Amino acid sequence: MDDQLIDRSYFTTLYKQIRLQEFLEVAHTILQDRLENGFGKTVKGVPLGCLPVELFREHFSTFRYWRSYTKERPAFINNEKVMVQHLYFTFNARSGFPTLSSGKEWVKKKVEKKDSNNPADVAIHEYQKVTFIISIRDTRVECDFKMATNTPGSEQAQQQQQQQQQQQLGDIPIKQQITSSNNSGNSQQQQPQQQQQQQQQQQQQQQQPQQQQQQQQPQQQQHLQQQHQQQVQQLQQQQLQQQQLQQQQLQQQQLQQQQLQQPQLQQMQQPQQQQQQQQPQYTPQQLMQFQQMQQAQQQQQQAQQLQQQMGSSPTHSSPTIKQEGLTGYTQIPQGGIINTNTNLNGTGGVSPNQPMPNSSPILPTNASSVVPPVVSPPLPTSNNNSNNLGTTSPQQSNSSEISHQPIVPLNP
């Protein structure tokens, strides 16, 4: 940090107001330096006012007491060795680590004018230096503020020094002109100095509320962040509650719909069950008979088509097939079927020309009750006709042979 020329009033207000704050800021730089560069380092010119103070405020909040002492040290001012009285303020923490020190140096050098006895010509040059020192073990940090105040005659002393240098170079006429002009301007320079001091005091007063505001800003920001987090949490809780309520309402609606649909389903199922009960239930035997009837009808239709193709007359009856029974012959039309199965009630199966309902015609099963013979035209007979009555040859028993003789039952 470059040296800053300030007046005494600025130093006093600065020292009283921001002493601890600047110490804490410098302590931050020390810790960083120890981590980066190791031990035994000396850091000078640390910039102040640009580091977060609140990081280290807690570490230095347990100070017990202050201790002050003075010590004289040599210093070189204008290439002259001068003893300086250094005033230290030391802050001791409970643990004794770290030790914070601040000191201020007062350097007064009096320059007298040898040519005249006028007190206005006496030049007093005053230096004031403040050093903030923080020592942590073997690490030392120094931050300096350099101040210079000019008392009446200080400018003359500076001019005299310039004149002495000029005398060595042989410029005597220039020296006389400078001394005459400086005497006339001393009275005019005092007024601007007072005005500058007043302006600086006003600036210091304006800086105080700004510093307070800067300290309050982080606290306000933290408070606002906490409020924002609380609001976010409340909103999340409300959303969860709303979701739970919606789920409960959906479940209730589903239960109500199921309860309403159950009687409707029962009503829909009842007529279906009644229809199933009303439908007739056929046995496997009846189904087989129904299939055989369908096949017989198909065969009969095929036979009729063949007769039409052969040019047979419509008066001829369909050929019959002779079937040998136990008690006699039964004449079965080709493609037809006789149901010999009887139910418990004595009724037969389904007729070939009608469907399956219970009102199917009943066919007798006795050998005497046979299908009435179909009249066919007489054929020439031979001597063996009498012997062939009631008997059939193996060839006639074949289902493919057609008989043109009338079938007479054995048991009339």
From Swiss-Prot:
**Compositionally biased region (Low complexity):** 156-168, 335-345, 364-373, 381-394
Question: Compositionally biased, Polar residues: which spans?
Answer: 177-187, 310-321, 350-363
The name this protein carries in UniProt is Uncharacterized protein DDB_G0285291
Q: Where is this region: Disordered?
A: 150-171, 177-196, 302-412
Origin organism of this chain? Dictyostelium discoideum
